[in-house]
Amino acid sequence: MTVNDVTFTREVEPRLLLIHFLRDELGLTGSHWGCDTSNCGACVVWMDELPVKSCTVLAAMADGRRVLTVEGLERNGRLDPVQEGFARCHGLQCGFCTPGMMLTARWLLDHHPDPTPAQILEALSGQVCRCTGYENIVRSVQWAAQHHGGDGRGGHRSAPEEAG
């Protein structure tokens, strides 16, 4: 599988979940393992440019696929507008839900560059934030939309490099 533009080849135990592969095998701990029931959305990553809850995907199912985690959002040392929006507009408190929220927001902006607050809330409806109201999260996504948020990041990835 290719994760954040780096190709990895590993043998995995057949029941290993993608979230555990990313965190335990690759050391990519930005994605969080939350509810273990596919309800909270803290584990959202992209698989072939679609948001998926990585606690519901076997690592083996990602073979030959492209995976994007929150660590892969920044480019050339610059934060993605979604990441910057969450920081500037106080879209997080504890931060546990934030990686999944950011990846879902990035997908939304890539497909709807100027979403309404209702569209933002609908896109994020599969994710739970227990700390904040969603007002600052919506503001964060709106900020990103106004600052080159729909930059097509998902469709313009560089060629993957090889890793062990």
Where do the protein language model's features map onto the residues?
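Signature of N-terminal electron-transfer/Fe-S-associated modules in redox systems
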Residues: 1-164
